[in-house]
C-alpha cells in the first residue's frame, strides 16, 4: 500500500448534485426549487423561527427567570473531591491548585456527597451540616 494509491471504498462517495444542467439530469430548469416563491429566488429564504407572519413560538411564550451572577463565582464541592487535594489543610487556594475549582471561583461550599477517608482541616469554606458531621467523624475539623 502506498499513499498515492489510497482511495475511498467503492460507492462510498456520491457525486455532487449539478443543478440547472438540462432536463436529462432531473435537476434542470428550476433546479429542484419548484416555481416562483421566496424560496425559489436567489438569496431567498426566511430566518430561523419565522412562522409565516404568525406570532412565533419564542414570542408567544413568557419570559421568566434569570441567571444569577453569583453562580459564576460560587462552586459546590463534594467530599469525594477532597481526595484530589494534597495536604491536610484545605482552603480555596488548595482547591484551585488541585484544579478542583476554576480560577474565577471566589466562594466554595462543601456538600455531603461521597466520603472523606482522612482527617482534614477545612479553612475558610462553607460547609453543610451533613458534610460537617462526616468530616468530624473522620477526625477532621472545620475552621471558619
Curated annotation (Swiss-Prot):
Can the keyword Ribonucleoprotein be found in this entry's annotation?
yes
Give the span(s) annotated as Disordered. 1-53
Similarity annotation: Belongs to the universal ribosomal protein uL15 family.
Please provide one cellular component term from the Gene Ontology annotations of this protein: cytosolic large ribosomal subunit
Name a GO molecular-function annotation: rRNA binding
Annotated protein name in UniProt: Large ribosomal subunit protein uL15
Q: Name one GO biological process term.
A: translation
List UniProt keywords, sorted A-Z. Answer: Ribonucleoprotein, Ribosomal protein, RNA-binding, rRNA-binding
Task: Provide the assembly information.
Answer: Part of the 50S ribosomal subunit.
Gly residues compositional bias, start-end: 21-31
Key word Amino-acid biosynthesis present: no
The source's domain of life comes to Bacteria
Q: What Gene3D superfamilies would the database entry show?
A: 3.100.10.10
Gene of origin?
rplO
Function, in words: Binds to the 23S rRNA.
PANTHER family recorded: 50S RIBOSOMAL PROTEIN L15 (PTHR12934), LARGE RIBOSOMAL SUBUNIT PROTEIN UL15M (PTHR12934:SF11)
